[in-house]
Structures are given as C-alpha cells and as structure tokens.
Amino acid sequence: MPKLAVVLLVLLILPLSYFDVAGGQAAEGDRRGNGLARYPQRGGRDNEAECQINTPGSSWGKCCMTRMCGTMCCARSGCTCVYHWRRGHGCSCPG
C-alpha cells in the first residue's frame, strides 16, 4: 500500500479514538467548538449544569446540561467520563 494511502487511512481512523473501546459513545458537542455553551452561573441554571468558570468572579461559565468530560459534554446524563491513555477523555454511555 503506498505511503499516501496509509497516511489517509490513519487520518480517517483517528477520529474513532473518541469512542470508548467497550462500546461507548463519543462526546457530543455543538459542532461549532468544544461542545460547551455559555450560560449565566446565576439563577436555577447553575443547579442543573456542570460548569467551568471562565474567570474567577465572573457570572459566566461554560456549562453542560448533561455531564462534563474534560472540556466536552457527554451525550446523555447517564454517561461516565473515562480517560484513555494517549487519547484523552471520552464519554462511556450505557446501552
């Protein structure tokens, strides 16, 4: 197999590393960035979401309405966040 074909095959398979080998599901984002939305940290919203504060003392943060995993949001709230050596964080979802 020519080297270019091997490189293209590797680049095609590389995104699959975001999936859990045991049948997990990829972390779901907003297709525009890291999957995190900006929500006010006040009111009832901060009780429902897992958030990362942008800056200390700020009323804005990056939040997930399901489960935050690294810098991404999992697809459903029942997912667990797992860390794969050399691949980073990913969501493992039941079913």
UniProtKB/Swiss-Prot annotation:
Residues making up the propeptide: 25-45
Q: In which tissues is it expressed?
A: Expressed by the venom duct.
Name positions with the PTM 4-carboxyglutamate.
Answer: E50
Q: Which GO terms describe its cellular component?
A: extracellular region; host cell postsynaptic membrane
Subunit structure, briefly?
Answer: Hetero-, homo- or pseudo-homodimer (identical sequence, different post-translational modifications). Heterodimer of [carboxy'Glu-48', hydroxy'Pro-54']Ms20.1 and [carboxyGlu-50, hydroxyPro-56]Ms20.4 may exist.
Please tell me whether the keyword Chloroplast is annotated for this protein.
Answer: no
Family in the record: Belongs to the conotoxin D superfamily.
Origin: domain of life? Eukaryota
Stated role: Alpha-conotoxins act on postsynaptic membranes, they bind to the nicotinic acetylcholine receptors (nAChR) and thus inhibit them. Through its two C-terminal domains, this homodimeric protein would bind to two nAChR allosteric sites, located outside the nAChR C-loop of the principal binding face and at the adjacent binding interface in a clockwise direction. This toxin specifically blocks mammalian neuronal nAChR of the alpha-7/CHRNA7, alpha-3-beta-2/CHRNA3-CHRNB2 and alpha-4-beta-2/CHRNA4-CHRNB2 subtypes.
Q: Which UniProt keywords apply?
A: Acetylcholine receptor inhibiting toxin, Disulfide bond, Gamma-carboxyglutamic acid, Hydroxylation, Ion channel impairing toxin, Neurotoxin, Postsynaptic neurotoxin, Secreted, Signal, Toxin
Q: GO MF annotations for this entry?
A: acetylcholine receptor inhibitor activity; ion channel regulator activity; toxin activity
Annotated S-S bridges = C64-C73, C69-C81, C74-C91, C79-C93
The cellular location(s) given in this protein's UniProt record come to: Secreted
Say if the entry is tagged with keyword Disulfide bond.
yes
Look up the signal peptide feature and give its range: 1-24
Q: Which residues carry this modification: 4-hydroxyproline?
A: P56
Question: What does its UniProt record remark on the domains?
Answer: The cysteine framework is XX (C-CC-C-CC-C-C-C-C).
Per its record, how is this protein called by name? Answer: Alpha-conotoxin-like Ms20.4
